[in-house]
UniProtKB/Swiss-Prot annotation:
It comes from Mus musculus (Mouse). It catalyses: L-aspartyl-[protein] + NAD(+) = 4-O-(ADP-D-ribosyl)-L-aspartyl-[protein] + nicotinamide; L-cysteinyl-[protein] + NAD(+) = S-(ADP-D-ribosyl)-L-cysteinyl-[protein] + nicotinamide + H(+); L-glutamyl-[protein] + NAD(+) = 5-O-(ADP-D-ribosyl)-L-glutamyl-[protein] + nicotinamide; L-lysyl-[protein] + NAD(+) = N(6)-(ADP-D-ribosyl)-L-lysyl-[protein] + nicotinamide + H(+). GO terms for biological process: cell differentiation; mRNA transport; nuclear envelope organization; protein auto-ADP-ribosylation; protein transport; spermatogenesis. The keyword Transport applies. This is Protein mono-ADP-ribosyltransferase PARP11.
Length: 331
């Protein structure tokens, strides 16, 4: 498992390193992660990292100006001791690395949770782009599942295209929120549903990158609270969809078409999202978050609905409870 420091390491000169490099000093190797913390190199069964901090230190002592290569389940990397950088040999992305004295008391685990794996059915995942849109083939089980939900209240023959949204960051936020709610409630499962959200084309890319934000996307009256609205039925969500003209591409990377833009069609867009509705209560226009269950500021409901006996409309106030999973284009 990776480790992190509580503070950034102070910079040291070459002479400082030479003076401190004694046989009694235990050295550790770290890389600067996306979160801004220094993480220790350690073998990890989830990502199948082939190198440890100890391995890097041995290589460094052999040749302080050399390099060492290693792999994970997805990529190959090279550590350059002269540049003090780690390079992804596939994408070219670089990270800063650092050698520093290791003390057990100075480090703690990043988190209690295991690394979150990506869904096994995702395809050609590129972690260096914000998101990917992958068109589903209409003969697949995945396509038919989405089309069937749409078809409960609308004619599925109106569907022109269904695309899977692959956003690693949003997926991780969603999974961690789900784990947090389960831990807080002390339950093995949290109430989760696939729900529809209709919108206009101008918001589609922002949602795919940043998730839903009612302050930007609008709340259509906010009758049940100031949050993001979802519907059980596609027919209801279709009221908020606007016609748009776009090209009929089959694969996109963060909104950039990989095919020629020569076929233009008029269609509307609707999201099918995975939503943690949890414990819900009847909504109210004054709510800016779910109300309390017992009057405290701690024990809150997770979402609001139009009718607790037969909910058709759901309002979510925390975007981490949402993963925008599919984009449905229809006429």
């Amino acid at each position: 498992m990776f480790h992190k420091t509580e503070e950034f390491f102070p910079k040291k000169t070459d002479s400082d390193v030479d003076d401190m490099d004694t046989s009694d000093t235990q050295w550790g190797w770290f890389y600067l992660a996306e979160c801004g913390k220094w993480h220790m190199f350690q073998p990890d069964t989830n990502i199948q990292c082939s190198v440890s901090s100890e391995d890097i230190e041995k290589s460094f002592k052999t040749n302080p100006c050399g390099s060492i290569s290693f792999t994970t389940s997805k990529f190959s990397y090279k550590i350059d001791f002269a540049e003090m950088k780690q390079m992804n040999l596939v994408t070219g992305k670089q990270r800063l690395i650092k050698r520093a004295p290791f003390s057990i008391s100075a480090f703690s685990y990043i988190c209690e949770n295991e690394a979150i794996p990506m869904p096994t059915h995702w395809e050609n995942v590129n972690p260096d782009v914000p998101y990917q849109l992958v068109s589903l083939q209409n003969q697949t089980h995945e396509y038919n599942e989405v089309a069937s939900l749409f078809g409960k209240t609308m004619d599925r023959n109106r569907i022109k295209r269904i695309q899977r949204i692959q956003n690693l960051d949003l997926w991780e936020f969603f999974c961690r929120k789900k784990a947090q709610l389960k831990k807080k409630r002390g339950v093995p499962q949290i109430n989760e549903q696939m729900l529809f959200h209709g919108t206009s084309s101008e918001f589609v890319e922002a949602i795919c990158i940043h998730n839903f934000d009612w302050r930007i996307n609008g709340v259509h009256g906010a009758v049940f609270g100031k949050g993001t609205y979802f519907a059980r039925d596609a027919a209801y969500s279709s009221r908020f969809c606007k016609d748009d003209i776009k090209h009929g591409n089959t694969f996109q990377i963060h909104g950039v078409s990989l095919q020629q833009r020569h076929l233009f069609r008029t269609y509307k867009s609707m999201f099918l999202a995975r939503v943690l509705i949890g414990d819900y209560i009847n909504g109210d226009s004054k709510y800016m978050r779910p109300p309390s269950k017992d009057g405290s500021y701690v024990n809150l409901y997770d979402s609001c609905v139009d009718d607790t006996w037969n909910p058709k409309i759901f309002v979510v106030f925390d975007a981490n409870q949402i993963y925008p999973e599919y984009l449905i284009d229809f006429h």
